[in-house]
């Protein structure tokens, strides 16, 4: 037996290994054609079996791998966000196009009844928004040719919101109605409910005292003229206070406030300086609370940076005659608001009644906890009066002519259908009416929507009555049996519709809740939900502040208002508020 040397043995082993590999490759090539692979082949060879190409098969990714699932989630979320942004921009663009390009309207029909609407506030505009103007010849009369979004009015004097951002032209509203409406910029001075005539007065120009007096006959009248600020007969309020109900009021507050700040720069007497920089807000309702909060924000965020000399003397005081501010809110939110004001260094004087006002000093009477009363004197630079309503002269004049209105002081007495007591075909809504509900924008808005549906139903009822009368006349002159059956079937159908249209329910207010901004990016919300019963939800803080903003934006009348308000908020966040006089 021959013994191989180690070198020869190594060569033989190498050749054997090479031969084995060659054999495996040959078998693999054969099995590519047959589509099978023997079980004994290595894993690398098995992976090539059954394929027509020469490349090794790439393993498929594991779809259930956590990283790949996460990647798919974020990619889907990005696509959804991208598509939502495109859809939102498309919708906004469409709405802007519709606003800028109103469609043609039906011409006025002299045969229709004349409906006169007095006012351009929450009640009147909500009424016009829902009214089918093709049923009437509509005439709108108001000295203010725009609708004002009053919940954001306290933000205007400080520059948080530009006043034009919360104004919507009345002509822009009625131009988008189905049929033509007429607008007259004038004051209603007299309402003759017996002759059914409204007398209006309009100035020809600002620089002319010449006036135009016109009488407008009407079939139906909607009175929504609102109310004026009440001074409660307190001496000096009308002459020295700034009110907060209209755009000119907000502009007057701005001028007065900046005048006091600029005067304080020249004043060396510390007491006079403190007086000039002291702003007193009378009224602890939402308007007064929100303005006090906005003013303190204006000082903290802007004034103290650009006018550092006033930082030690600037002061805001809120005066309320009731035991607490925001009386319509829950006790928890009242306490939270008062604590927030204390943290913001806003002074609150509750149970305090103003007795008189002169040019520089407010005299008030405060009731202590033990029932004793103390007289207070508050030097002030700016006085903002944000409490109380009283009826307008045209409403008072109408009330004096109707015996059923003699006992009313708050406004026109109305029944459950908002019809003015003692009249026919005259309705009143909003702050000019006296109901069991609070005089708020929410109440006026719901009254306007209800009244529009009521008037639409009245028009439908009249049309059905006319159609029934015509069918009855037609049946008298028809002798064909089949045609008579068709007429009677139509009469029965229209009679059912007539009964349904007449079955109008009385007005019922649905309270949705109350909101108020309390400063430092915080707000309070007292909301009501009707889910199998009334449910109340109270909240306060920063998250409620963002809810307050989103709610007010959604309540803005038009897409234009929504966009402008959001832009104003962004401008203040980026650049701060303007500190110029105007």
From Swiss-Prot:
Membrane topology term: Peripheral membrane protein
Record-listed NAD(+) binding positions: 277-313
One term of GO molecular function: NADH:ubiquinone reductase (non-electrogenic) activity
Needed cofactors: FAD
EC number: 1.6.5.9
Enzyme class: oxidoreductase
Swiss-Prot/TrEMBL catalytic activity: a quinone + NADH + H(+) = a quinol + NAD(+); a ubiquinone + NADH + H(+) = a ubiquinol + NAD(+)
Segments of this protein annotated with the region Disordered: 46-65
Subcellular localization, as worded in the UniProt entry: Mitochondrion inner membrane
Transmembrane segments: none
Residues holding FAD: 114-144
Keyword Transit peptide: yes
Annotated transit peptide: 1-30
Cofactor note text: Binds 1 FAD per subunit.
Taxonomy, superkingdom: Eukaryota
Keywords for the protein's UniProt record, in alphabetical order: Coiled coil, FAD, Flavoprotein, Membrane, Mitochondrion, Mitochondrion inner membrane, NAD, Oxidoreductase, Transit peptide
Biased amino acid composition, Basic and acidic residues: 54-65
Function description: Alternative NADH-ubiquinone oxidoreductase which catalyzes the oxidation of mitochondrial NADH does not translocate protons across the inner mitochondrial membrane.
Family: Belongs to the NADH dehydrogenase family.
Protein name: External alternative NADH-ubiquinone oxidoreductase, mitochondrial
């Amino acid at each position: 037996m021959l013994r191989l040397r180690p070198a020869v043995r190594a060569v033989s082993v190498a050749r054997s290994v090479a031969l084995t590999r060659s054999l495996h490759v040959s078998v693999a090539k054969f099995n590519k054609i047959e589509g099978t692979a023997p079980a004994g082949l290595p894993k690398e060879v098995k992976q090539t079996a059954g394929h027509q190409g020469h490349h090794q098969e790439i393993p498929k990714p594991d779809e259930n791998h956590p990283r790949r699932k996460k990647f798919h989630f974020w990619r889907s979320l990005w696509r959804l966000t991208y598509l939502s942004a495109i859809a939102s921009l498309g919708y906004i663009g469409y709405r802007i196009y519709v606003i800028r390009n109103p469609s043609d309207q039906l011409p006025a029909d002299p045969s229709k009844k004349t409906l006169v609407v007095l006012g351009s506030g929450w009640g009147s505009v909500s009424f016009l928004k829902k009214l089918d103007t093709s049923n009437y010849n509509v005439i709108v009369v108001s000295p203010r040719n725009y609708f004002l979004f009053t919940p954001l009015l306290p933000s205007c004097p400080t520059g948080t919101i530009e006043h034009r951002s919360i104004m919507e032209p009345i002509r822009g509203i009625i131009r988008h109605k189905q049929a033509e409406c007429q607008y007259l910029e004038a004051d209603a001075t007299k309402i003759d409910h017996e002759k059914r005539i409204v007398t209006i007065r309009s100035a020809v120009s600002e620089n002319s005292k010449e006036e135009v007096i016109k009488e407008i006959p009407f079939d139906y009248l909607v009175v929504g003229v609102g109310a004026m600020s009440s001074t409660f007969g307190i001496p000096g309020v009308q002459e020295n206070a700034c009110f907060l109900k209209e755009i000119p009021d907000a502009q007057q507050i701005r001028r007065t406030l900046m005048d006091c700040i600029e005067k304080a720069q020249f004043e060396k007497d510390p007491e006079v300086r403190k007086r000039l920089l002291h702003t007193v807000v009378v009224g602890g309702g939402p308007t007064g609370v929100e303005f006090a909060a906005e003013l303190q924000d204006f000082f903290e965020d802007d004034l103290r940076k650009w006018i550092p000399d006033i930082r030690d003397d600037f002061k805001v005081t809120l005066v309320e005659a009731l035991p607490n501010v925001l009386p319509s809110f829950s006790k928890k939110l009242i306490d939270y608001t008062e604590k927030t004001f204390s943290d913001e260094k806003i002074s609150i004087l509750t149970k305090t009644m103003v007795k008189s006002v002169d040019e520089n000093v407010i005299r008030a009477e405060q009731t202590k906890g033990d029932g004793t009363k103390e007289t207070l004197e508050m030097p002030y630079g700016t006085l903002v009066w944000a409490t109380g309503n009283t009826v307008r002269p045209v409403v008072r004049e109408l009330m004096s002519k109707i015996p059923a209105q003699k006992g009313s002081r708050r406004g026109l007495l109305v029944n459950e259908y908002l019809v003015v007591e003692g009249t026919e075909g005259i309705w009143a809504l909003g702050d000019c009416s006296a109901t069991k509900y609070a005089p708020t924008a929410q109440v006026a808005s719901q009254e306007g929507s209800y009244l529009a549906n009521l008037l639409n139903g009245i028009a439908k009822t009249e049309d059905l009555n006319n159609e029934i009368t015509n069918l009855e006349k037609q049946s008298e002159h028809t002798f064909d049996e089949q045609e008579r059956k068709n007429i009677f079937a139509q009469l029965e159908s229209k009679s059912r519709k007539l009964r349904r249209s007449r079955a109008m329910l009385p007005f019922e207010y649905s309270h949705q809740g109350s909101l108020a901004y309390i400063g430092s990016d915080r707000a309070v919300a007292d909301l009501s939900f009707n889910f199998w019963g009334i449910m109340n939800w109270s909240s306060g803080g920063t998250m409620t502040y963002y809810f307050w903003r989103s709610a007010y934006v959604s309540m803005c009348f038009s897409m234009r208002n929504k966009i402008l308000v959001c832009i104003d908020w962004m401008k203040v966040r980026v650049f701060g508020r303007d500190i110029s006089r105007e």
